[in-house]
Amino acid sequence: AGGFKEPHWDWSVEKFYHHWFASDRHMLGLLDELGWRDKVLFPRPFTVMYHQGKFYPFDSILKAILFPGLGWGVHKARFGLVGLYLRLTNNWQGLEAHTVDAWMRKWAGDFVYQLMWQPLMNGKFGERYADQVNMAWMWARLKARTTRLGTYTGGFQAFADQLTAHLRSLGVNIHFSTPVEQIEPQPAGGLSLRIAGQSVPYDQCLVTTSPGQLARLAPALPPNYLQGLLELKSMGAVVMTLSLKQRLSEQGYYWYNIPKSAGFPFLAVVEHTNFVSPEHFGGDHILYCGDYLETDHEYFSLSQDELLKRFLPPLQRINPHFEPGWVKNAWLHRTAYAQPVPLVNHSRNIPAIQTPVPGLYFASMSQVYPWDRGTNFAVEIGRRAAGLMG
């Protein structure tokens, strides 16, 4: 949830676009505790879906009914009934034994699945995992999310900075840019953290990295626990952020969902300043172009200039008047751990928060299942971990 800020901006911009939902009770509850709820904004942005060369609004029940791709017959009825069932049921345990691919083809039908859901799965999980993800993931996505999207006044970096200052005022020591190299249990109890070549003793340690990073940090974990960590799959993310001289979407659309089959070099285009005003960014129009990818994809090795040459021309398919000269600045951010991949019966494979090493705890986005990753569930699992640590 890190951000960055240009000198002429009043607000920060996130490196990897995200937002809160109106249903995010853990995150909003924390903000209530801190007395900062009044700084949460819930604008009403517009989301669109690509179909046969055009973009159509798709962010409400009415817009879904009017979406031309489904027609007016049985396909639209099956789409609506499946969506209604998934919102009403709480039996995610029964769903996780089935893949999204198999379950949706059976109940929504091949046509509806291939038009509406398969592009999402291909975009999120790539060719390797798209047909392996279990149905509980889709259930949780539809169950928890709302059309209202929230952000924090000043940007999420402003929230992080305020929280840091608040914690320090309570006597909490926070060390930035201090990477831990290894975590080792001590014979007399407790843990030793190697930091900059020095061993520092601690009674307890909560690791919040990816599962693979924990395995590298704590090789003293039992082999079966280490193997379980390394078997968990995830997708990386590549996000290009652009500041433009003028708005890209003439209609004021915020989120463009783009299927891989459409031939765009990214999964989504998100015009942040159609969500919050460009006045917060000195009049700049902020645009994200992002994709979920496996870490061996070429986007993880191409330079920013090489990616710009690929990303800019397709923007003319959104606005034919777009020109590269509109771009004032660009920033490229990549992460190897962005989207956990929950396979069939994933609940059996989730590592416990309390690891087999006394005093060592683990809380990550791979453990908030069946829910999808997000700051809301980071707060929830953080509270659970704190309760276990006493």
Predicted region positions:
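A conserved FAD-binding loop/helix module that cradles the flavin
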Residues: 365-389
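Mobile amphipathic helical/loop "lid" adjacent to a hydrophobic cofactor/ligand pocket
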Residues: 11, 23-135, 140-147
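FAD-binding beta-loop-beta segment adjacent to the flavin cofactor pocket
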Residues: 134, 276-282, 335-362, 366-369
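Helical element adjacent to the flavin cofactor pocket in flavoenzyme catalytic cores
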Residues: 137-195, 203-204, 208
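Mid-domain catalytic core of redox enzymes
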Residues: 179-287, 292-301, 305, 310-321, ...
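Conserved N-terminal glycine-rich FAD pyrophosphate-binding loop of Rossmann-like flavoproteins
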Residues: 1-19
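A short coil-to-beta-strand element that immediately follows conserved catalytic motifs
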Residues: 41-42, 237, 251, 322-334
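Short beta-strand to alpha-helix junction loop
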Residues: 18-25, 92-100, 108, 143-166, ...
